[in-house]
Amino acid sequence: FGASASKTAILRSDEASGNSDYAKPGMYGSSLNSSFYTIMQPFGLLYSTASQASYVIENVDKVTFPDEALKNAYKGEAYFWRAFVHYYLLISYRQVAPIRHAPESAADYVRVVEAPGAVWDFIIDDLENAKNLLPHKGYWKGVNVGRITAAAAAALKGKCYLYRSGIEPLYGESTKTYYDEAAAEFNEIIKGSYGGYSLVEYSWNFDVAHENNDESIFEMQFLGDVENASFNPGTATSGLAFDTRGLMLPGTGVGYEAVVHDWLYDAFVSSLDNDGKTDNRMFSTMIFNDLKAEIKLRKGQRLTGPGGYHFEDYYPKGDFSSVGNTRTYPYKAAVLKGLDLSMPMRNNDPTSLNGVGAGTKEYIYNQPRAHGVNWRYIRYADVLMMYAEAVVLGGKVGSLSAAQAFNKVRERSNMSTKGAITMEDIKSERILEFALEGHRFFDLLRWGDLASRFKSLEKSDPNFKKLISDTDYEGFTENKHEWLPIPIAELESNEYAKQNPGY
């Protein structure tokens, strides 16, 4: 997740474009094939995690622990991670040959691809086991803060019920929905059954200083490193850091940059709070020129980026035409979420975005590929929003109404509340609350909106997915691009594996 998986999730969506290898899956072109490394690496590493988790599940009881609760916590973590990687394989690649037991020989890696319903059941069973074994909030102390808790298992279980209810009626053979089950899992978290979670200052969810805060339910832990910045997914040191290549600011060099599509920028500009000011969440989501008249600043408010500088410090012309890559010029904003602003700059000249010397790779930060911002995969805000969605779609009302849960998220950002909500309200709010966090593509997938959304933007936005070139983006193809291709190595080594349609 520090490399291909997170960037692929973001850049496959309609939110942003990049010009790195990580962006290729989101270009939907002929270069996206089953041998491309950003397809192969997540697939292999996710299965590797499933194997390791299975070994722990089957062997941890053989180890003597002074504390039974600690043994249960470790076993619960293993169940959780095995569930999570299978869940992510299922929503990304669709065809999954689950690892139900620890492989003992090469033959054990040749497994039958099971029906999606069976895989969902396996994932949910693992999460139930995890939930019953894992500790509640507050158990982990010191260096262990941030490890998996029962609330994370409950939240992911609810998320699986919600995703299954959307995906399978559209792409599978079952029309059964699980909105009651989803709402019930989320409601237990809202009630405080696993400890108290709350909404914090929005910006705290995307920085280093406030990691593992009271809003964090499932947070992947990363550690910035200014010395060891080389990134090889699967190696010991690489797993410690978040690789920002493919999400960096315009001017950091082709292969590193990303831009935000105008529709997302415009959505935030149109979102005004109760005081008539620009939605505060915009300032933690993207880098943009906040001195434009259309941006309604609060007294003393300014957007700050790397080194504490402002947009005009990096881009004196007021837009991206200040830097060398002409393909960035038409866009209004760039990605901010995921960037570690605590990392030191190599020099104090913010206009020297592309290094301190000809031919160097010493961009904005000391090293751009070893950032330390944790990836908050499930926040309490997401639990509230998913609960509201499950209830709107027919799930049983728990301790809050759908509108009450929805309004809690809105109120945190000083936005107006609603007396009743619809799915359109939820879709709009998820854009503003969770932009560029890796959920948008899968939201569109489970709502059945992917193809229509991409076709609409292909017609209305001449710069949509054009950061690499005018021709790399070949258009979203329905009944193909919902899923990533199965890697060639899997097709060649597993007789039961078949390629996804269209590849």
Question: What kind of feature is each model-predicted range?
Answer:
Residues 1-11, 26, 33, 40, ...:
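Acidic, glycine-rich segments characteristic of secretory precursors and extracytoplasmic regions
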Residues 1-20, 128-131, 147-324, 454-457:
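An aromatic- and glycine-enriched ligand-binding surface/loop that stacks and positions planar moieties
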Residues 16, 46-49, 122, 144, ...:
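Long, intrinsically disordered, low-complexity segments
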Residues 19-93, 109-121, 127-142, 340-345, ...:
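Conserved, well-structured interaction surfaces
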Residues 24, 273-379:
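Flexible, polar/acidic helix-loop-strand segments at domain edges
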Residues 90-97, 163-172, 393-396:
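Short coil/turn linking the two alpha-helices of tandem helical-hairpin repeats
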